């Protein structure tokens, strides 16, 4: 469980300490910084897995990543607090406008050896272009002679995923053929949805059947997926399906955008726990869904959060109506910087006797709406 995150100097986030729960629902006006918070997880995952320089280059350099650019911000830092361990890092600007590590550390307590550990991941260097966590895992394993405890921090950092199912165009990855064995995990854009569903159908039939039932609730015309290897010999598979009462096989392009997104969401949130990321992060999952499907989505999010940590950003009042006040994290802009606030539940008791939570958001009782 990622309990707390402290970010300084990233995009619109000047300095914020954010407490997270098993299910965290971000709400806020356009431009408040929800997407920047989501993108921070992408940044950190890339930096931990040795792709920092590529990520910075693709994002437009440090100028596009630091709070108000290079003139306003010279360094960025993060501290992540997990249950039993923590990680911190500081980044400064290179001469060519990228970022590099000037501090990186991991901290925790090994239960089996009854002793804390506190290590610098820079080793003997004063800085480095990529994370040193892999190097230190090797050293840590040598010191403690115990595989498992050594990878705790990296596992916590690298196994989360940010999902974004917005692209349902004809050229979207989820509508294209995919290698039949590309199924280790569901891709961020569901580009391997067909091969992943095929894996579940063959090896986790109960979970596969739950996904099919979920899709039928949102789309009563849906019968089942048709998941078969390309009949013309290539080792690929594509998403196909059948309608109730018909033998005709339809391609994914025959599904509405909302139905296709709901298929992706159901697959993500109803897959076996052992295949799930440690943290599931979804940007605006309600896009294109009708009101009943949004209600179903809320149930899926709650179910998934009983297994793994879930972070969601949303603009949907009907979706927010399905959650508790303690689930919400209100994102706003104050003095040109993004701030994050939890609700004071004691102040909302009377309001909640008369209104749903989303309605209070719409009325700007709990904040998170545009302000002058």
What are these regions (language model features)?
Residues 1, 295-372:
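C-terminal lobe/lid and adjacent interdomain/linker elements of RecA-like ASCE P-loop ATPase modules
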Residues 1-14:
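N-terminal pre-Walker A segment at the start of P-loop NTPase domains
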Residues 15-21, 272-275:
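Phosphate-binding P-loop
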Residues 21-59, 189, 262-268, 316:
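Phosphate-binding glycine-rich loops of NTP-binding sites
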Residues 39-100:
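Conserved P-loop NTP-binding catalytic core
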Residues 236-238, 243-247, 251-282, 292-294:
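GG-anchored amphipathic helix commonly corresponding to the ABC/SMC/Rad50 NBD signature/C-loop
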């Amino acid at each position: 469980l990622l309990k707390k995150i402290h970010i300084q100097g990233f995009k619109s986030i000047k300095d914020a300490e954010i407490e997270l729960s098993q299910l965290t629902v971000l709400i806020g006006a356009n431009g408040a910084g929800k997407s920047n918070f989501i993108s921070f997880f992408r940044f950190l995952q890339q930096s931990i897995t040795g792709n920092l320089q590529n990520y910075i280059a693709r994002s437009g350099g440090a100028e596009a990543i630091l709070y108000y650019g290079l003139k306003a911000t010279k360094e960025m830092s993060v501290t992540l607090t997990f249950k039993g361990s923590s990680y911190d890092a500081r980044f400064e600007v290179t001469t060519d406008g990228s970022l590099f590590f000037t501090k990186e550390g991991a901290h925790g307590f090994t239960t089996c050896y009854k002793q804390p550990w506190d290590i610098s991941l820079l080793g003997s260097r004063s800085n480095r272009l990529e994370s040193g966590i892999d190097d230190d895992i090797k050293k840590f394993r040598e010191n403690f002679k115990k595989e498992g405890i050594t990878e705790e921090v990296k596992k916590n950092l690298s196994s989360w995923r940010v999902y974004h199912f917005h692209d349902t165009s004809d050229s979207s990855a989820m509508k294209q053929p995919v290698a039949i064995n590309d199924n280790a995990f569901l891709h961020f854009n569901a580009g391997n949805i067909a091969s992943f569903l095929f894996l579940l159908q063959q090896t986790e039939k109960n979970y596969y059947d739950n996904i099919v039932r979920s899709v039928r609730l949102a789309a009563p015309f849906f019968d089942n997926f048709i998941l078969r290897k390309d009949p013309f010999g290539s080792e690929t598979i594509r998403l196909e399906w059948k309608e109730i009462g018909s033998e005709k096989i339809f391609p994914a392009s025959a599904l509405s955008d909302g139905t296709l997104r709901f298929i992706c969401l159901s697959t993500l949130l109803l897959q076996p726990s052992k295949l799930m990321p440690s943290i599931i992060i979804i940007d605006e999952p309600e896009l294109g869904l009708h009101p009943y499907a949004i209600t179903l989505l809320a149930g899926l999010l709650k179910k998934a959060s009983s297994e793994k940590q879930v972070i969601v950003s949303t603009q949907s009042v009907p979706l927010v109506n399905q959650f508790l006040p303690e689930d919400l994290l209100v994102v706003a802009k104050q003095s040109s910087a993004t701030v994050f606030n939890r609700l004071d539940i004691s102040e909302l008791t009377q309001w909640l006797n008369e209104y749903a939570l989303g309605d209070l958001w719409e009325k700007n009782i709990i904040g998170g709406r545009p302000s002058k």
